[in-house]
Amino acid sequence: MLRLKNDRFIRALLRQPVDRTPVWIMRQAGRYLPEYRQLREKVPNFMAFCKTPELACEATLQPLRRFPLDAAIIFSDILTIPDAMGVDLHIAPTVGPVIRNPVRSAQDVNRLQMPPVEEALSYLFDAIRLTVKALDHRVPLIGFAGSPWTLACYMTEGQSSKTFLTARAMLYQQPDVFHTLLQKLTTLTIAYLNAQIKAGADVVMLFDTWGGLLTPSLYRQFSLDYLSQIAAEVVRQKNGRKIPLIFFTKNGGQWLESIANSGCDAVGLDWTTDIGQARRRVGDRVALQGNLDPAILLSNPESISTAAVDILKSYGQGSGHVFNLGHGIDPSTPIENVAALVETVQNFSIKNEEPINSYYR
């Protein structure tokens, strides 16, 4: 197998020497790009778009044509697994995901399908294979999934929410039923990520977007324990190469040490956590990813550069940092501000003194 021409991102995740801090952007393929909006016009239905491998591949590649990013992330959605399980999923243009048959009882959980993922989600794996071929080993490709807790939030609530009160109440009212749902989601997520790796993903990431809504005790029981199970069962080596695993729990800074001990290689931080303090807290256990506030990208290039440099300085010297936002980029972000961010990170490189012997050579 040919080595990656740019393995900076993977090296940083594995805390190996790098020449500069790698950078990519959560939701880097999306509505802030005019070419993406034009592409979406071909298939207005979002899930139908995701299920068209050629379009998903093109959307994945678009940001790399504009910006010298150090990784690509496959264009998809975290709700592909619930969709494959038989929930009646609809993506409303102004509302977001709506599930018309929410899962709120043991009977509802028992009715969920457990399909072979390589068949039910073949479109995603086809998109990965197309993208790997198109990338031609230029940069690594990230595969991803939603955390079981985050997927369960949507499935039980029936739609997006700032509080997911229905989901949280169900933890107290029907904990055994909720655990059964989470275990089903965990089983499928493991198979899903492994199939993405088989198709060609170089890195996999779990988005625990709503983990920060939980109490410390409930976070461990209903989110982190399942993330740890995934970490233990996802393929971590392929053809002699390590496959790094990233966990991102939004508003999860208070549990940073626990997340670092869960079996992942890197922890994503949102913008509410100081990255320098986070580095001191986790030591050399994991790499860190983040953590610029996406809102600053709505300001001006000078403010963006200052904030980015502050984060780079706060992390300090040495490898183990992947620069990213603290959450997904806002659709209204000006293109020139993204360019300013990427340029700043590339130009402000705190180099290692160690010689760089590529992991892939």
Curated annotation (Swiss-Prot):
Keywords: Cytoplasm, Decarboxylase, Lyase, Porphyrin biosynthesis
Main localization of the protein described in the UniProt heading: cytoplasm
GO cellular component, one term: cytosol
Cell location: Cytoplasm
Residues at which substrate binds: 27-31, 77, 154, 209, 327
Pfam families: URO-D
Source domain of life: Bacteria
Molecular function per GO: uroporphyrinogen decarboxylase activity
PROSITE patterns in the record: UROD_1, UROD_2
Coiled-coil region: none
GO biological process, one term: protoporphyrinogen IX biosynthetic process from glutamate
Reaction catalysed by this enzyme: uroporphyrinogen III + 4 H(+) = coproporphyrinogen III + 4 CO2
Marked site positions, Transition state stabilizer: 77
InterPro entries to which the protein is assigned, alphabetical: UROD/MetE-like_sf, Uroporphyrinogen_deCO2ase_HemE, Uroporphyrinogen_deCOase
Listed EC numbers: 4.1.1.37
Family: Belongs to the uroporphyrinogen decarboxylase family.
Subunit structure: Homodimer.
Function: Catalyzes the decarboxylation of four acetate groups of uroporphyrinogen-III to yield coproporphyrinogen-III.
NCBIfam families: hemE
Protein name: Uroporphyrinogen decarboxylase
Organism: Coxiella burnetii (strain CbuG_Q212) (Coxiella burnetii (strain Q212))
Biological classification of the source: Bacteria, Pseudomonadati, Pseudomonadota, Gammaproteobacteria, Legionellales
Gene symbol of the encoding locus: hemE
